[in-house]
Amino acid sequence: MKETKFELYELKPFIIDAVHRLGFYEPTDIQKRLIPAVLKKESVIGQSQTGTGKTHAYLLPLLNKIDPAKDVVQVVITAPTRELANQIYQEALKITQGEEGSQIRSKCFIGGTDKQKSIDKLKIQPHLVVGTPGRIADLIKEQALSVHKAESLVIDEADLMLDMGFLADVDYIGSRMPEDLQMLVFSATIPEKLKPFLKKYMENPKYAHVEPKQVTAAKIEHILIPSKHRDKDKLLFDIMSHLNPYLGIVFANTKNTADHIAQYLTGKGMKIGLLHGGLTPRERKKVMKQINDLEFTYIIATDLAARGIDIKGVSHVINYELPDDLDFYVHRVGRTARAGSSGQAMTIYELTDEDALVRLEKMGIEFEYLELEKGEWKKGDDRQRRKKRKKTPNEADEIAHRLVKKPKKVKPGYKKKMSYEMEKIKKKQRRNQSKKRK
């Protein structure tokens, strides 16, 4: 068996076996910086984008330090969405295969499932708990789940926890754990409103900020399509009808807009998946199954509903509108061009979007321009073409400039007088040109 660079961390044999099975050879940047700190039981803040290997940066060392001989909860991992919680749980199960690893009991508790069944599962306490904050907090309140001896708490996607209003539940969970708690916080951004919470639980945490090499994947084509005061719904339908995606996601900023788009497209005969925060757990589960079964070519989604969900095979992302928070643009387009594949991110833009587009360009995003004319894709005009266009002076302009000189001593209104004199000369030049042609 080929040795990997993970052997340097003195991890248990079952962890090293898992690393080989998963095909890992060299730790990612965030793993190099955080695995040693987590093994030393230090609290950490990891700021990184999706796809940097952050999940294994905490799973590998935390599973390594669990003692299966102790029948108590030792690690609690919280995630803002059911889908993300389940993904983390599945990764944990992959690591704990084999004779030694299988002694670690892991359980996943998420909202939208039967609470009594969850309570029944807790007659024997697991070593590792993964779940959504609301459900974990409920189980602690019911005295079904005991976390008072758990040494480590993970808060994944902390900025999304804040956005979705889950911080109070996380605070409750943390308050029921030991005072010398090891807290591991992972977030794409660290908003100001999150800082008081971090200060409450963390003293001199190790901080690792992994800057993405590129804001978005190299193989994403960023395409701008002007609305030009056209009916936006019809334009969207036309765009979707002239693409051939494996799977496409249309992003809207609000639940109401997503509902409106879905209703319009359904009326046009399209079979559409819909993902937003207004769905019941049962509806959401059904849509996710339909997506995984490839029943849809397109999904309409809002930002918060789509965060934390791993949807495979997305070839196209369409922004019905630009997000208010431009970080979400990066999250949206990051749905496509994964694992080295290519993808297209199309944005319908208005004239009022100019400021946002300039800011995205300053982040390093280069846009192409396309137009859909009579059912055919054509290269569009650069929205900056008017600003970039240089005025070419004609002969009359040049003569007028030469003949009308700026006075040495200027008086109020001189520009107007100069302009008037130049216009007189230009008219005379045009009359002379006209006579010559006759």
UniProtKB/Swiss-Prot annotation:
Keywords: ATP-binding, Cytoplasm, Helicase, Hydrolase, Nucleotide-binding, Ribosome biogenesis, RNA-binding, Stress response. Residues 35-208 form the Helicase ATP-binding domain. DEAD-box RNA helicase that plays a role in 70S ribosome assembly. May work in conjunction with the cold shock proteins to ensure proper initiation of transcription at low and optimal temperatures. This is DEAD-box ATP-dependent RNA helicase CshB. SUPFAM superfamilies: P-loop containing nucleoside triphosphate hydrolases. Induction: Induced by cold shock. In rich medium highest expression in logarithmic growth, expression decreases and then disappears in stationary phase (at protein level). Protein level not increased at 16 degrees Celsius. Not detected in minimal medium (at protein level). PROSITE patterns: HELICASE_ATP_BIND_1, HELICASE_CTER, Q_MOTIF. Residues 235-385 form the Helicase C-terminal domain. Belongs to the DEAD box helicase family. GO terms for molecular function: ATP binding; ATP hydrolysis activity; RNA binding; RNA helicase activity; RNA strand annealing activity. Residues 380-438 are annotated as: Disordered. HAMAP family: DEAD_helicase_CshB. Residues 392-401 have a biased composition (Basic and acidic residues). One of its GO terms (biological process) is ribosome biogenesis. It is found in: Cytoplasm, Nucleoid. ATP binds at S48, Q49, T50, G51, T52, G53, K54, T55. Interacts with CspB when cells are transcriptionally active. May interact with RNA helicases CshA and DbpA (DeaD), may be a component of a possible RNA degradosome complex composed of rny, rnja, rnjb, pnp, pfkA and eno (although rnjA and rnjB's presence is unclear). Specifically interacts with pnp and rny. Disruption phenotype: No difference in growth at 37 or 15 degrees Celsius, decreased growth at 16 degrees Celsius. The presence of CshA or CshB is essential for viability; in a cshA disruption mutant further depletion of cshB stops growth after 1 cell duplication. Others show a quadruple disruption of all RNA helicases (cshA, cshB, deaD, yfmL) was not lethal at 37 degrees Celsius, although both 50S and 70S ribosomes are decreased, but growth stops at 16 degrees. A double cshB-cspB disruption mutant cannot be made. A double cshB-cspD mutant grows slowly at 15 degrees Celsius. Decreased amounts of 70S ribosomes. It comes from the Bacteria. A motif (DEAD box) lies at residues 156-159. GO terms for cellular component: bacterial nucleoid; cytosol. Disulfide bonds: none annotated. It holds the Pfam family Helicase_C.
